[in-house]
Structures are given as structure tokens and as C-alpha cells.
Amino acid sequence: MYLVVGLGNPGKQYEATRHNMGFDTIDSLVEDYNVPQGGVKFNAMYGKTMIGGEKVILMKPLSFMNLSGGPVREMANYFKIDPESELIVIYDDIDLEPGQLRIRKQGSAGGHNGIKDIIRQLGTEKFLRIKVGVGAKPKGWDLADHVLGRFSTEDRKLVDEAIAKAAKAVDIIITQGTDAAMNEYNRKVPVQK
């Protein structure tokens, strides 16, 4: 069984913002696999599906980004998920250009407060991450204003493609393994603007 978590902030005012790449990817998976809404548990929306014969729980924490760890820990404990082999977390990354994707098996939070809280709550940095590039903040901008802002039309197109790739990466991780997904998506591919 896998727990696939998309990070974001709940509420209409945060829809389509840079910080909601995880939510957007979960929405894409829900659509791709026609996942019925499972309800709310542990301050998170979730649904269950099957991918490649594996049970998969798709989850969007309803806490704000910086408090994502509690709902993730509670859901993982409830479904007896091993974070090191059965947890996939999808989130935005300002160190990647819009449209780029990176898959990592473990690592630090890299300044991402949602990941920092998950690491704190789980007590480990060893869990799989899919990072969706949203681009660096412009000089002089506040980081919060940047990640809570919306994309230009040009960047939105690139990010929508990256969200589709992130959803496909989840499928590949589950059906073919993490290394296959990393080989497919961690290549340095120039982003066409």
C-alpha cells in the first residue's frame, strides 16, 4: 500500500498558486484514476484507488502547508504505511525552473516548511519526494508572496505539463520502481518557453 501526499494550502484563495503543486498533482491523479472522494480523516481529504495492483491512498492535508506533518503522520500510522518505502510526497520547489521535475529518495527539507514539518513529525528524512519546479523568487520579492502567487500564462503551461509528469511519475514509481521514475524524470531537460 502507498500513501501519496500532495502538499498545498486549502481554500479557494490558494488554488493555482505556486505552493499548491502537490494539491494540483493529487487532483490530476484523482481525475486520471477516477478516484471517488473518500472523505476527511485526520484533517486531510483522501481517496483510495489501485495502481498496478497496489492499493494507493491519495491525500491532501487540510492543515496549512507549515503544519502538514501531523495529518501525514496520523494517516501513515492509521494505514500502517512505512515512510521509507510506501510514502510519496509531492510539493513545489523554488530551486527548479517552472516545468522541471525532480524525484529524490530522501534528503533535508531544503527550506520547505511543509517538508520540514513532515520530517519533524515522522522523525525521518527518508521518504520519497517528487518536486515540481515553480521558479525562484524575483529579486526584492518576499518568499511568501512568491509561493502564494500565481504563474504567468507562459509558466502555467509549463507547470501544467510538469503536474501531468508528476502524476505519471507516481504511476511509474508504483509499477516499475523509484529508479525507473528517476531515470525518466531526473534528466536535465531544457524547458521550452
Question: What label would you give each PLM region?
Answer:
Residues 2-106, 116-120, 124-130, 137-142, ...:
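Nucleotide and nucleotide-moiety/phosphate-recognizing core
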